[in-house]
Amino acid sequence: GKISKKDKQLIGLACAHMTSCPYCIRSRTKLALAAGATAEEIAETVFIAMRLAIGQPYAYSSIALENFDKMKNKESVTEGSFFSKNITPQIKDFHEHSGTMFEKFSVFNEKVYEDGHLSKKLKKGLMGLACAILAKCAWCIRSCIRDGIQEGVIKEEITEAINIAMVMNAGACWAHAGITMEVVDQSLSKTK
């Protein structure tokens, strides 16, 4: 593949944080360390997941604000497509009403994505994209693709990052299957 083994493990670790799977987090942390990742790279990876976890509710605030305005004006809220629209007006409205919280978010956003132990290309274009897909945020996906192109990401790297996200999402289900089967066993033993 086009992405190094270490970077794949770091992308997987970011995705593990997005799925909130403690087993996946432990496993991917060990695999990332074994692939040569440093503690600093792992810490930056967690911050990328945190940033994208913020991204979905941030972008979706546009839906809430648009609906608020439409409902206050007694307009229909069932027409149009939220995912293809330009959310800039509602995001600006959100910024205006957020006070100093938006300034703090902006500082966090810039710090998370600046070059550090991990490259902007990995953080914005690949790790960010994988997390955005798991956050199911169309606008986050769009911005990660835009940023990734600016950082030189190629389509093969994007598809590898997406595949990592898919595997990690399924991995969270697999890792928690034991809980399900434990409940099944307990329930069946009570009925016998």
Q: What role is predicted for each listed range?
A:
Residues 1-192:
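Hydrophobic alpha-helical segments
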